[in-house]
Amino acid sequence: MRMLVSKSIFAEPEPGYYAHTPVSLVICAPNMPDLLSHRLEDGFRAASRHAEALAKLQYRDPNAKDVLGFQLAFSTTKSYWDYVEEDDPECGQRFSKAMRAVTVNKLGDVPKLYPFNKLVDDGGIIVDVGGGMGQVAQSILSHWHGLGLKCIVQDKFASKSGSTHPDLEMQSYDFFSPQPVKGSAAYLFRHIFHDWPDDACITILKNTVEAMNPHQSRILICDQIMEETNPSTAAVLYDIDMMCLYGGKERTLSEWEELLKAADQRLEIKNVFRSPNQVSGILEVQLCCD
């Protein structure tokens, strides 16, 4: 306890008596132990072999087929996603619960940050790509209720019976395949692209562009937008974590622009929505039709 007090995780108001701090209360939050477990059991193991993996790559950015710290630490040739699906479902469950903790703590950011009411005139259909169990979609519908918005939550393991909201539909979909929902007002990607290297992201974006209505559809990317210089400690730690486990990375605004142009020269960032003192934001991307 003394060590935890010295790190400001707990307080010691008087000798022999200990009290919670804001830090310890966060640790007690629902699913937070799963997030810590994911970071320690998966992230730290992968990080322990990160330097070795980088040396094998000759210190270049990885692509989707490269061997990463994760593969070396877990003695596999499979990607993280294939590994947890096929070989270690317990690891996959740990990740799912960890992401649930992240979603719960950040749930209010998305519906408040972007003016979803502007989508109504373009049909009001929001496709939440890789949207998991639909928590974010439900928060959008609750915050902007009564406007006629509808959400389609796409996830590889989505269950059609998993939706309890009348304006929410669950749809099984792998975003490396052609997008089946055409001409939606918005295609939302929340914390998707930072899990993947550029070549994989380009494939996802190209599949999305093929489905877009060039005059009204937009892509909404909710992800970190790193500072161009002197990024925060939190941002660079996430950046390393993404590379060790998945081969992904956090991106600066200029890197987002380069990625979008690599997928389709017509893609342009029209607006950037950010909260003060927050690394994450929402990029509103549309096709430029001159």
Swiss-Prot record:
Signal peptide: none annotated. Pathway: Secondary metabolite biosynthesis. S-adenosyl-L-methionine binds at residue 155. Keywords: Methyltransferase, S-adenosyl-L-methionine, Transferase. Pfam families: Methyltransf_2. Disruption phenotype: Impairs the production of aspergillicins A and F but accumulates aspergillicins C and G. The keyword Ribonucleoprotein does not apply. Gene3D superfamilies: Vaccinia Virus protein VP39 (3.40.50.150). InterPro entries: COMT-like, O_MeTrfase_dom, SAM-dependent_MTases_sf. The active site is at 194 (proton acceptor). It comes from the Eukaryota. The keyword Ligase does not apply. Belongs to the class I-like SAM-binding methyltransferase superfamily. Cation-independent O-methyltransferase family. O-methyltransferase; part of the gene cluster that mediates the biosynthesis of the aspergillicins A and F, 2 cryptic cyclic hexa-depsipeptides. The hexamodular NRPS agiA catalyzes the condensation of the six amino acid residues including N-Me-L-O-Me-tyrosine, L-proline 1, L-proline 2, D-isoleucine, O-acetyl-threonine, and L-isoleucine. The starting condensation domain (C1) of agiA probably loads acetyl-CoA which is condensed on the N-terminus of threonine by the first module to yield O-acetyl-threonine. The second module then loads L-isoleucine. This is O-methyltransferase agiB. The gene is agiB.
